[in-house]
Amino acid sequence: RHNPILLTDGYKPSHHKQYPPEVTHTFAFLESRGGPFDQTTFFGLQYLLKAYLAELTITLEDVDEAYAFFAEYFQNPTIFNREGWEYIVREHAGKLPLEVRAVPEGQRIPIKNALLTVTNTDPKVPWLPGYFEPLFVQLWYPISVATQSRAMKDIILANLQETGTPELIPYKLHDFGLRGVSSIETAQIGGAAHLLNLGIFEYPPQRREPAAQPAHGAGRNKQHDQQQHHARHGQLNAA
């Protein structure tokens, strides 16, 4: 089990001292500022929340552990917000008073738009949304994988539609990420993000008639007949 209080950057525990006393709420958001694609595919939030935040309860033992850690880290026992975390344990039974809103997972969103927002629901903990910023930024990885995988799928699917076998799209872009990432968990997260695009062809899946002939090995002079066949079966423009 992870101690949620330790899932942050080293300097974050000092930020509670920097908010003006009249501040009661803060509002944080995550967006894609830009990149090679004009849209991002949002994915990974549900796993992050369930694994690290929503289903965990902060205990006094967690607070004691974090206090000891940051007292040594800062060489100062007064930096860590022990009072604030004990308040969460006492008044919220260890549950984080945060409200997280997000676009639906799997949805493509134009860049420079908010993908998720985080705010505190208790006016006594305005420092809390920013405290977990580093954890929410972990979403960069599943979002990046899902976005790039979707872009690759679009390119492959366009060519499959031209050559007559778009129903083969689930088998045209394979995931070999396990051997190239830093941990088993990273591979699981990246694999799930890729599976979002290529694991199932349609939502919900629909039964299709098999193609009359395979596309592989067909020359350009055979493509017209194949396209006519699939157009008659409603497969040419499948997405």
How would you describe each model-predicted region?
Residues R1-P36, I88-P97, G106-I109, L115-A239:
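Buried, small/hydrophobic-residue-enriched core segments of structured protein domains
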Residues T26-N81:
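Low-complexity, highly charged intrinsically disordered N-terminal segments
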Residues G44-L48, Y52, D62-F69, E83-Y87, ...:
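Exposed alpha-helical structural elements
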Residues F69, F74-T78, R82-V89, A93-E99:
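An acidic, glycine-rich surface segment that forms the CoA-thioester-binding/catalytic face
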Residues A102-V103:
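Outer-membrane beta-barrel transmembrane strands
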